[in-house]
Amino acid sequence: MAFSDYKNISQTQREFGIAYREERFLFAAPVLPPQSFLADLEFNLANMDIFTSKASRTELVISPLLREAYKRFYERYAFWIQKPLNYSEKLSGIPDYLIATKSALGKTVLETPLVVVVEAKKNDFEQGWGQCLAELIAAQKLNDNPSLPVFGIVTDGELWKFGKLIGAEFVLETTGYTLTDLPELFGVLLHILETAD
């Protein structure tokens, strides 16, 4: 089964025996992104209809924001866009984004996956989380360390939701963040990358 075949959290839970709970677990100080990033984002928001298509959300909001957060941690992590992640026939596919520990062998080798990001197609967060949880399970199994948290993000570019898988329990962060709360959102992204490994 491809990751995208999982349509909601409960389907993925039942398939793999994962418990579920909701909790506020992300506490991060707001951080303002660099001025150059803010200028580009403000230009895009003012002059382009960035939320009309998946491609525009990807290229003008999601990728730039993830890349900006990643820049502060590039010595520790590798940042992948549509890198295949295959554990088994039931857990395989291509995550939209993946952040993993950096390999001593270079940027072409995938090491320990720590963060997976799923774009909520057509703003469907229910399906996005079903897919994301399957990707988190695959990442956890590839890591061969169930006690190491693996973080998931589902976003449509405007709303960003967070979760984590530890052992056989998935925890959904109760607070969502939007572009209008950019310092809070950016602070949470940095906090996840700071604590991921």
List the predicted regions and their residue ranges:
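An amphipathic alpha-helical core segment
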Residues: 151-159
